[in-house]
């Protein structure tokens, strides 16, 4: 084994933060130093040349001064017997670089901690430095040799029920954490007595996972009686009623991994499977929709919990039908009170929590990062979501109890697209190969399905921790590329059947696959790819290692499937074959036995149906009179409540422009304020139709009136999605996610009554279907605190997500108040019809109260009329701005509109209030409704339309936006409230800022927060030195000659399709080229005029961002020759964007004229930054930027490592004067800047892109390929038609070729 020291592992900011954490744990800690340690398992001595290559490979990341370590060593390594995702990718890179003597590379972090501490304190330090699920801590570098030793497989064990009877199975139930019910234990004893043998542990685990509440939804399928009265339908039956009443537009419901609804027809853009040339195929592009929860893992380990939650939901979409493509994501969090240190709010009363789960604040720091990191690396934009906190002591008939979300809600959802012919699963023929696609088995996430079905606190902490999975998004990306290549083959798609691997691992996925295909299966356990050879059969079969799919591929299609996997470098294995008889057999060639041999009907068959006999409880509540409150104090409290406050800290960490199909993200207007009501994507690059999604949830209302909380969640979803242009209300389909503390007094009846209100009443009345959903029935946390039994129980929680096809994505409304449209009015549409019910409102919560009467949807006809009128007014161009009324009420809706429009407000409440005592309730009630901005000359017509629809009593003019910074509210001329927009916006932004400050580089957070005080910030602007609507490539396109451009990608790259679309539009033939094509000699770069290296996360950024990709080109002789030859050709051009920019900057030794280029390293904020930034095009030789010098315009940014690092100040100066700086970040006034967030990565002198001395090679961190259409821009000037300003860049390249 070779030991190679690496670079320091912590930036200055991360170092001081970790040192502070360690000092809090162990006060004797006085110093800390951390560096990477690399270990190489070699089968022979390396030559000096090979050693040099290895040394260069392992030099990556930013240049940080190296120290001589002192202090006690805590060496954090991957657990022995495992292979980390880092290791598998780094080892791949080494092999691609010709280092065949290296069998494996592995990496650890050597922490050197100074101070005098005891062994107990040393253990506390070790606990803080590692994740015991996947890592261990050593005190000696040499001990790392055990990384490369192989453990012996553990054998099978049987449970002796023939001899030991029921007691033996009850013992196994506890030890293995199976969560079997009494009747299931009886069922298993009967079944195995019938088979005449003892069950193996693997069979029991498999049964427990397949029949867990998590997988079987027993409560939703149960029979019920309430208060002694038998109920006619099950919960699931009532949800399905919505489909039975209105099934039009639904292509698949309740039977697959996601549901499918009818989409628009467009030119679906992808590479031809034979020629690899990108092109558009005109066809229906149907919409798939799915929303999942990952609550249990997120409570225990928020980053991996939320990451694998997102990953699992993405796999559900990809595994729909015969293979589909995920498109856009959403995320949601509900937690208990945050109690931010130094920012604890008056309503946040400390109650404590069990040891086994983390705090609400930790969940909101780590969880969103996990979810965002997975989506970012996979390459899916995160476009909408919600965030709520709730934790309150309430009085019930049984005494006081705390209701809240110690077991959080972590919601991961999204939509995708699927071809019409692939919506339904195919046939599994006898003899079909049963394949696992994706990563290897590892001992992680064991028993997750059963664990998440228990109330937190009823299983052991070790079992809880073992049930959390770990993520590897780059592997999932590779799997998705395989699935994409398969569905792109159309009727030659080799996939006949596909499922994702989730709860229960292969033990759930393979039986489900063959059972759904009406087959049995025969499997060989040792064919499962396995990175932990010491696992027992149960562990191999049931672990929940992520990023895996199971597929059935016909024998005749297998070679085609295999070739696709090899090109994409995606691991797969044939584990079994389909049989005619419905028997499940798993053989084990290592031990020569059969760990599983049972009829599928025993596993999945007649397990007893649950019956629930429950009683209703009287409703609870307390008195709350808002009229006695000080309005200024109320405003301040409400604006700081997390459900109301800015969600910026959740949004800028997630890529919102990847795919180039995003038409509406959360950030609105020239000042990019996070207030959008819905998310909208384009169907494809050639149309203006699309898809919308929006969310609704009002969970605290369930404590007062559970059915009202369900109806309000649906109502809010509709008032949110109404901002997009949708043909008719029934086009909207809903996902319903139900969370409940089943068994808690009154909760089961509340659940039943709410499902009935939604499924049997409101949805049928609206003509809306719920074709998909998910339930989580164990929303309670119990623990003992110094002998006192404590518990926190969540309210019944229905989270609704709406999806719909969109008629015209250019007509999506936003809350941005327009000050350039003359005199305008603000009109309130109050669907509560003046009732102003305050129950469970944010205002009540910020005073520790609930109130008594919840807002509700009293009449479905009002909601239908509202939707129709808004759609009509939008279609006719009458609405300038739109925002729904929700958390915080009318006051918050109008303030958010003013924040987005950077203007003041003059509100007068004369038309909506009768007396002063009503004013607080009018400003803060959360009844359904919306505020719209219309031109004053159109106000009579707009009011008349509402009147004609029966909503005359719901509408009133409440004021006007004004062109200054003042917010004033009056009643009959008397002032009610006044404030400055800037200061109110700071209050609204402060909760987000406080979390950002704890999580990211505090200096950056401070700069962004202070920028809100700037008075004359003009926002994003456009100043062009060319005509955006002038197509300079048109004459060349007319000739019919289309030069070829190689759209280059490596494993983990995810931005190739939109890049190809931009070049295709400019008149090129874009060809899909994988690095594996170049390494294998399948592709010759001499066939291409241009090459573009695309964005993403090549090798998951292992060995540095873009560095692994570059080094596999530098140190592979065939690839090096190919690239060098291409760069030296005077008729060739090259573009590198984001990850491609990082990659090309590391290839500078092959690129003539690139000697001034920097190295790109971690952003100054230490965070992934997804924003719209202003850049100025510099005077340079770049062939892409000719005629654009001096132009200033917005561009999409999405990167974690974009900081341009030069060797020293002289090198920076040389670059500056060499004329090779192509782009610089500027502030909204047009000045070159290093200030955050205008300069999102902190690059010196605002450097955002470089070119070569002759201009043929250009690299940049921003993403022009994501904003080449006008509609792709989060904000754009109104005079832009089809093209965005950045389209000019691609047309310049086409003109240059001629």
UniProtKB/Swiss-Prot annotation:
<feature type="binding site">
    <location>
        <position position="886"/>
    </location>
    <ligand>
        <name>ATP</name>
    </ligand>
</feature>
<keyword id="KW-0436">Ligase</keyword>
<dbReference type="InterPro" id="IPR029062">
    <property type="entry name" value="Class_I_gatase-like"/>
</dbReference>
<dbReference type="InterPro" id="IPR041609">
    <property type="entry name" value="PurL_linker"/>
</dbReference>
<dbReference type="GO" id="GO:0004642">
    <property type="term" value="F:phosphoribosylformylglycinamidine synthase activity"/>
</dbReference>
<keyword id="KW-0479">Metal-binding</keyword>
<comment type="subunit">
    <text>Monomer.</text>
</comment>
<dbReference type="GO" id="GO:0005524">
    <property type="term" value="F:ATP binding"/>
</dbReference>
<dbReference type="GO" id="GO:0006189">
    <property type="term" value="P:'de novo' IMP biosynthetic process"/>
</dbReference>
<dbReference type="InterPro" id="IPR010918">
    <property type="entry name" value="PurM-like_C_dom"/>
</dbReference>
<comment type="pathway">
    <text>Purine metabolism; IMP biosynthesis via de novo pathway; 5-amino-1-(5-phospho-D-ribosyl)imidazole from N(2)-formyl-N(1)-(5-phospho-D-ribosyl)glycinamide: step 1/2.</text>
</comment>
<comment type="similarity">
    <text>In the N-terminal section; belongs to the FGAMS family.</text>
</comment>
<dbReference type="InterPro" id="IPR036604">
    <property type="entry name" value="PurS-like_sf"/>
</dbReference>
<keyword id="KW-0963">Cytoplasm</keyword>
<feature type="region of interest" description="Disordered">
    <location>
        <begin position="303"/>
        <end position="327"/>
    </location>
</feature>
<dbReference type="GO" id="GO:0046872">
    <property type="term" value="F:metal ion binding"/>
</dbReference>
<feature type="active site">
    <location>
        <position position="1265"/>
    </location>
</feature>
<feature type="binding site">
    <location>
        <position position="676"/>
    </location>
    <ligand>
        <name>ATP</name>
    </ligand>
</feature>
<dbReference type="InterPro" id="IPR036921">
    <property type="entry name" value="PurM-like_N_sf"/>
</dbReference>
<dbReference type="Pfam" id="PF22689">
    <property type="entry name" value="FGAR-AT_PurM_N-like"/>
</dbReference>
<feature type="binding site">
    <location>
        <position position="677"/>
    </location>
    <ligand>
        <name>Mg(2+)</name>
    </ligand>
</feature>
<keyword id="KW-0658">Purine biosynthesis</keyword>
<keyword id="KW-0067">ATP-binding</keyword>
<dbReference type="Pfam" id="PF02769">
    <property type="entry name" value="AIRS_C"/>
</dbReference>
<feature type="binding site">
    <location>
        <position position="884"/>
    </location>
    <ligand>
        <name>Mg(2+)</name>
    </ligand>
</feature>
<dbReference type="InterPro" id="IPR055181">
    <property type="entry name" value="FGAR-AT_PurM_N-like"/>
</dbReference>
<feature type="binding site">
    <location>
        <begin position="305"/>
        <end position="316"/>
    </location>
    <ligand>
        <name>ATP</name>
    </ligand>
</feature>
<keyword id="KW-0315">Glutamine amidotransferase</keyword>
<comment type="function">
    <text>Phosphoribosylformylglycinamidine synthase involved in the purines biosynthetic pathway. Catalyzes the ATP-dependent conversion of formylglycinamide ribonucleotide (FGAR) and glutamine to yield formylglycinamidine ribonucleotide (FGAM) and glutamate.</text>
</comment>
<dbReference type="InterPro" id="IPR036676">
    <property type="entry name" value="PurM-like_C_sf"/>
</dbReference>
<feature type="binding site">
    <location>
        <begin position="384"/>
        <end position="386"/>
    </location>
    <ligand>
        <name>ATP</name>
    </ligand>
</feature>
<dbReference type="GO" id="GO:0005737">
    <property type="term" value="C:cytoplasm"/>
</dbReference>
<keyword id="KW-0547">Nucleotide-binding</keyword>
<dbReference type="InterPro" id="IPR010073">
    <property type="entry name" value="PurL_large"/>
</dbReference>
<feature type="active site" description="Nucleophile">
    <location>
        <position position="1138"/>
    </location>
</feature>
<protein>
    <recommendedName>
        <fullName>Phosphoribosylformylglycinamidine synthase</fullName>
        <ecNumber>6.3.5.3</ecNumber>
    </recommendedName>
</protein>
<dbReference type="InterPro" id="IPR040707">
    <property type="entry name" value="FGAR-AT_N"/>
</dbReference>
<dbReference type="Pfam" id="PF13507">
    <property type="entry name" value="GATase_5"/>
</dbReference>
<dbReference type="Pfam" id="PF18076">
    <property type="entry name" value="FGAR-AT_N"/>
</dbReference>
<feature type="binding site">
    <location>
        <position position="716"/>
    </location>
    <ligand>
        <name>Mg(2+)</name>
    </ligand>
</feature>
<keyword id="KW-0460">Magnesium</keyword>
<feature type="active site">
    <location>
        <position position="1263"/>
    </location>
</feature>
């Amino acid at each position: 084994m070779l030991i190679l020291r690496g670079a320091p592992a912590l930036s200055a900011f991360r170092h001081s933060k970790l040192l502070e954490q360690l000092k809090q744990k162990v006060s004797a800690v006085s110093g800390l130093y951390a560096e990477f340690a690399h270990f190489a398992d070699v089968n022979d001595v390396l030559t000096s040349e090979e050693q040099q290559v290895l040394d260069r490979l392992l030099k990556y990341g930013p240049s940080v001064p190296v120290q001589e370590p002192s202090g006690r060593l805590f060496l954090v390594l991957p657990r022995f017997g495992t292979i980390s995702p880092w290791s598998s990718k780094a080892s791949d890179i080494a092999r691609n670089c010709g280092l065949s003597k290296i069998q494996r590379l592995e990496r650890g972090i050597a922490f050197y901690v100074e101070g005098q501490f005891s062994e107990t304190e040393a253990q506390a330090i070790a606990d803080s430095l590692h994740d015991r699920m996947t890592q261990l801590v050593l005190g000696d570098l040499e001990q790392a040799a055990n990384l490369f030793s192989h453990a012996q497989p553990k054998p099978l064990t049987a449970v002796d029920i023939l001899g030991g009877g029921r007691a033996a199975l009850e013992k196994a139930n506890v030890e293995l954490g199976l969560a079997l019910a009494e009747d299931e234990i009886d069922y298993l004893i009967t079944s195995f007595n019938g088979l005449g043998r003892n069950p193996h542990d693997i069979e029991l685990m498999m049964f427990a996972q397949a029949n867990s509440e998590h997988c079987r939804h027993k409560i939703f399928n149960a029979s019920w009686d309430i208060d002694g009265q038998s109920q006619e339908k099950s919960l699931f039956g009532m949800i399905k009623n919505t489909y039975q009443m209105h099934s039009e537009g639904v292509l698949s419901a309740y039977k697959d991994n996601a549901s499918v609804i009818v989409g628009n027809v467009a030119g679906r853009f992808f590479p031809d499977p034979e020629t690899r040339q990108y092109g558009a195929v005109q066809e229906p592009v149907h919409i798939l929709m799915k929303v999942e929860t990952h609550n249990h893992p997120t409570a225990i380990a928020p980053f991996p919990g939320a990451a694998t939650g997102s990953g699992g939901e993405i796999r559900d979409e990809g595994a729909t039908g015969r293979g589909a493509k995920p498109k856009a994501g959403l995320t949601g969090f509900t937690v208990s009170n945050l109690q931010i240190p130094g920012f604890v709010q008056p309503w946040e009363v400390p109650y404590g929590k069990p040891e086994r789960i983390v705090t609400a604040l930790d969940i909101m720091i780590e969880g969103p990062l996990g979810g965002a990191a997975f989506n970012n690396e996979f390459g899916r934009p995160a476009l909408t979501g919600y965030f709520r906190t709730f934790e309150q002591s309430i009085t019930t008939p049984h005494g006081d109890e705390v209701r809240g979300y110690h077991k959080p809600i972590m919601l991961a959802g999204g939509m995708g697209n699927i071809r019409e012919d692939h919506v339904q699963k195919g046939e599994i023929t006898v003899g079909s190969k049963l394949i696992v696609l994706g990563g290897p088995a590892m001992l992680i996430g064991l028993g997750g399905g059963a664990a998440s079905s228990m109330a937190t606190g009823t299983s052991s902490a070790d079992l809880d921790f073992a049930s959390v999975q770990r993520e590897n998004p780059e592997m999932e990306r590779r799997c998705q590329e395989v699935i994409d290549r398969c569905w792109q083959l159309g009727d030659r798609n080799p996939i006949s059947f596909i499922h994702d691997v989730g709860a229960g691992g292969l033990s759930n996925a393979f039986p489900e696959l063959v059972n759904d295909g009406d087959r049995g299966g025969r499997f060989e356990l040792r064919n499962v790819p396995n990175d932990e050879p010491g696992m027992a059969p149960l562990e191999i079969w049931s672990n929940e290692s992520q990023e895996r799919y199971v597929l059935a591929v016909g024998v005749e299609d297998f070679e085609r499937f295999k070739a696709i996997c090899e090109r994409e470098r995606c691991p797969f294995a044939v584990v079994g074959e389909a049989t005619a008889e419905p028997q499940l057999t798993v053989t084990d060639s290592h031990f020569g036995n059969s760990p599983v041999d049972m009829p599928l009907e025993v596993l999945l068959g007649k397990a007893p149906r649950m019956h629930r006999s429950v009683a209703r409880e009287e409703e609870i509540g307390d008195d709350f009179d808002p009229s006695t409150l000080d309005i200024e104090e109320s405003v301040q409290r409400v604006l700081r409540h997390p459900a109301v406050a800015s969600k910026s800290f959740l949004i800028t960490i997630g890529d919102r422009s990847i795919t180039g199909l995003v038409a509406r993200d959360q950030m609105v207007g020239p000042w990019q304020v996070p207030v959008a009501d819905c998310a909208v994507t384009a169907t494809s690059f050639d149309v203006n139709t699309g898809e919308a999604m929006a969310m609704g949830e009002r969970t605290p209302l369930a404590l007062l009136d559970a059915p009202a909380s369900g109806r309000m969640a649906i109502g809010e979803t509709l008032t949110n999605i109404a901002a997009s242009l949708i043909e008719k209300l029934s086009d909207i389909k809903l996902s319903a996610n139900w969370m409940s503390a089943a068994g808690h007094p009154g909760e089961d009846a509340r659940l039943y009554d709410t499902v009935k209100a939604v499924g049997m009443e409101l949805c049928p009345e609206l003509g809306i279907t719920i074709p998909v959903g998910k339930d989580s029935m164990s929303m309670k946390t119990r623990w003992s605190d110094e002998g006192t039994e404590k518990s926190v129980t969540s309210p019944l929680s229905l989270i609704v997500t709406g999806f719909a096809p969109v008629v015209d994505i250019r007509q999506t409304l936003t809350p941005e108040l327009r000050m350039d449209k003359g005199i305008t009015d603000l009109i309130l549409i109050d669907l509560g019809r003046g009732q102003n019910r305050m129950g469970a409102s944010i205002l009540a919560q910020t005073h520790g109260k609930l109130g008594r009467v919840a807002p509700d949807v009293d009449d479905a006809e009002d909601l239908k009329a509202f939707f129709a009128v808004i759609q009509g007014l939008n279609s006719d161009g009458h609405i300038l701005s739109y925002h729904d009324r929700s958390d915080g009420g009318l006051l918050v809706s109008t303030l958010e509109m003013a924040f987005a429009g950077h203007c003041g407000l003059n509100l007068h409440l004369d038309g909506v209030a009768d007396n002063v005592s009503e004013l607080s309730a009018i400003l803060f009630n959360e009844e359904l409704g919306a505020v719209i901005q219309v031109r004053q000359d159109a106000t009579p017509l707009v009011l008349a339309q509402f009147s004609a629809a029966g909503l005359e009593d719901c509408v009133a003019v409440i004021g006007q936006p004004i062109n200054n910074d003042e917010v004033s509210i009056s009643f009959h001329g008397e002032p009610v409230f006044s404030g400055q927009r800037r200061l109110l916006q700071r209050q609204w932004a402060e909760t987000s800022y406080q979390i950002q400050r704890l999580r990211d580089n505090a200096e950056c957070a401070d700069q962004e927060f202070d920028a809100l005080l700037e008075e004359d910030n003009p926002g994003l602007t456009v100043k062009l030195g060319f005509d955006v609507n002038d197509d300079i490539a048109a004459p060349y396109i007319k000739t019919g000659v289309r030069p070829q451009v190689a759209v280059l990608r490596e494993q983990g790259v995810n931005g190739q399709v939109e890049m190809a679309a931009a070049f295709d539009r400019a008149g090129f033939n874009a060809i899909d080229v994988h690095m594996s094509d170049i390494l294998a000699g399948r592709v010759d770069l001499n066939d291409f005029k241009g090459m573009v290296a695309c964005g993403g996360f090549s090798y998951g950024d292992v060995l540095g961002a873009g560095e692994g990709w570059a080094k596999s080109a530098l140190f592979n002789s065939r690839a090096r020759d190919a690239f060098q030859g291409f760069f030296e050709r005077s008729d060739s051009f090259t573009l590198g964007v984001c990850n491609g920019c990082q990659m090309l900057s590391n290839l500078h030794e092959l690129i003539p004229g690139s000697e001034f280029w920097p190295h790109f390293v971690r952003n100054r904020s230490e965070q992934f930054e997804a924003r719209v930034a202003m850049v100025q095009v510099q005077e340079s030789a770049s062939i892409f930027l000719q005629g654009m010098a001096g132009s200033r315009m917005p561009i999409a940014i999405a990167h974690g490592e974009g900081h341009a690092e030069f060797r020293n100040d002289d090198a920076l100066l040389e670059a500056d004067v060499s004329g090779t700086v192509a782009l610089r970040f500027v502030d909204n006034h047009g000045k070159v800047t290093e200030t955050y967030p205008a300069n999102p990565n902190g690059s010196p002198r605002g450097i955002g892109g470089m070119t070569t001395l002759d201009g043929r090679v250009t690299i940049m961190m921003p993403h022009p390929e994501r904003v080449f259409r006008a509609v792709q821009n989060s904000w754009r000037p109104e005079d832009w038609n089809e093209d965005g300003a950045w389209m000019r860049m691609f047309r310049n390249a086409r003109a240059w070729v001629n």
